Amino acid sequence: MQNQRIRIRLKAFDYKLIDQSTAEIVETAKRTGAQVRGPIPLPTRKERFTVLTSPHVNKDARDQYEIRTHKRLIDIVEPTDKTVDALMRLDLAAGVDVQISLG
């Protein structure tokens, strides 16, 4: 797999889970002899929702909720065959969304 690059994008609501997963990926890639760039923190997406607390009147009484989506980017520049096999066998947390692209 010469002159290839593996780009891994991670998304999660919990920043502790995403940091733990990135550490596992980086440690696995370095252990198998690949060159790693990252983890690069991407902008956090904040979704805010405003809900009326009263079912009928009192429009002034509202609750506000927020969901934060944390994102990280990892580039593995020169992956070996061992690296690809180790990443395929890696078991990450259930709350982390992983997108892998070859380039």
UniProtKB/Swiss-Prot annotation:
Gene3D superfamilies according to UniProt: Ribosomal protein S10 domain
Gene Ontology terms for molecular function: structural constituent of ribosome; tRNA binding
Keyword annotations from UniProtKB, A to Z: Ribonucleoprotein, Ribosomal protein
Alphabetical list of InterPro entries matching this protein: Ribosomal_uS10 (IPR001848), Ribosomal_uS10_CS (IPR018268), Ribosomal_uS10_dom (IPR027486), Ribosomal_uS10_dom_sf (IPR036838)
Pfam families: Ribosomal_S10
GO terms (BP aspect): translation
Tagged with keyword Ribonucleoprotein: yes
Source taxon at top rank: Bacteria
Record-level GO cellular component terms: ribonucleoprotein complex; ribosome
Subunit structure comment from the entry: Part of the 30S ribosomal subunit.
Entry function: Involved in the binding of tRNA to the ribosomes.
Family membership noted in the UniProt record: Belongs to the universal ribosomal protein uS10 family.
Name this polypeptide is given: Small ribosomal subunit protein uS10
Source organism: Aliivibrio fischeri (strain ATCC 700601 / ES114) (Vibrio fischeri)
Lineage: Bacteria, Pseudomonadati, Pseudomonadota, Gammaproteobacteria, Vibrionales
